[in-house]
A protein has these predicted regions:
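Metal-dependent phosphoester-hydrolase catalytic domains
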Residues: 39, 111-132, 137-209
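General secondary-structure edge motif
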Residues: 9, 93, 100, 104, ...
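Short hydrophobic/aromatic-rich motifs at helix boundaries and adjacent loops
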Residues: 22, 88-93, 117-118, 149
Length: 209
C-alpha cells in the first residue's frame, strides 16, 4: 500500500493482533513529512482508537485524525434475527458472543460511541493546527454523534457528495464513514468508491486551502 500510494511516510497503531502476523488498527500514509503522531486507545474499549498525525506541507502544519469508533459487533445470526439478509463478514476485532438482547447491545453501543466521539473531539479542540477528521464512526447522519461532529467540522459529503454515498458494503445505503474538516479547508470531488476491499467502501475528497 505504501508503494502503491507513493507515500513514503506513515504512522500506525494497532489494537488487535492475531497469531503475531495479522494486525488490526489504524494507519495514516502521507507523501508529506510527519512531524508528530500518537495513537490513543479509548478507555471504554481498547479495540477502538484514534491516531493523530501532524503533516508539514510547505510551511504549514495540519493535523489529521484517523478514527475507529465502536460498533455493536453484531454476528450473522443477529442480523438474521433483525430480518436483514446478506453476508455480513465479522472481523477479528468485531468478535462477540451471540446475545439475544439486541436492543440492550444497541443502547450500550450508542453510549460507548458517544463517549468515544466526545474524547476524540475534545482532543481535536486542543489542536494548534487546522484539522481533518476521517474514519469509521458506525453512526448515521441522523445520529447524536454526527451532530456533535458537524457542530465545528464540515462533512465533505455535504459540499460535493451525491446520492446516499453508502459506505457499508452489506447495507449499500448506510453511510457511517466520514471525512470532516476545519473551515480552513475547501473540499470538493467527494467520492464513495465501488471496490469492496473490506466490509466498508473507501471514501475520498480533495482538500485545498
Amino acid at each position: 500500500m505504501v508503494q502503491f500510494l507513493k507515500a513514503k511516510n506513515y504512522a500506525e497503531g494497532y489494537t488487535v493482533s492475531v497469531n503475531d502476523n495479522k494486525f488490526f488498527g489504524l494507519v495514516t500514509m502521507s507523501k508529506f513529512p510527519i512531524v508528530d503522531d500518537d495513537h490513543i486507545k479509548f478507555n471504554n474499549d481498547q479495540n477502538n482508537s484514534f491516531l493523530y498525525t501532524d503533516l508539514l506541507i510547505q510551511n504549514d502544519t495540519i493535523r489529521i485524525y484517523n478514527a475507529h469508533i465502536g460498533s455493536a459487533r453484531f454476528s450473522q445470526s443477529d442480523y438474521e434475527v433483525m430480518g436483514t439478509e446478506g453476508n455480513f463478514k465479522t472481523w477479528p476485532h468485531q468478535q462477540s458472543e451471540e446475545n439475544p438482547q439486541i436492543v440492550t447491545r444497541l443502547a450500550n453501543a450508542y453510549k460507548k460511541r458517544a463517549t468515544q466521539t466526545k474524547t476524540l473531539l475534545t482532543h481535536s479542540y486542543t489542536s494548534p493546527y487546522p484539522v481533518i477528521i476521517c474514519g469509521d464512526f458506525n453512526d448515521t447522519p441522523v445520529s447524536y454523534n454526527y451532530r456533535n461532529l458537524t457542530h465545528k467540522y464540515i462533512d465533505a459529503f455535504t459540499l460535493s457528495g451525491n446520492g446516499t454515498a453508502g459506505s457499508f458494503c452489506s447495507i449499500p445505503m448506510l453511510r457511517i464513514d466520514y471525512l470532516l474538516h476545519s473551515d480552513f479547508f475547501n473540499s470538493y470531488d467527494y467520492q464513495t468508491h465501488d471496490e469492496e476491499l473490506s466490509d466498508h467502501r473507501a471514501i475520498s475528497t480533495i482538500l485545498e486551502y
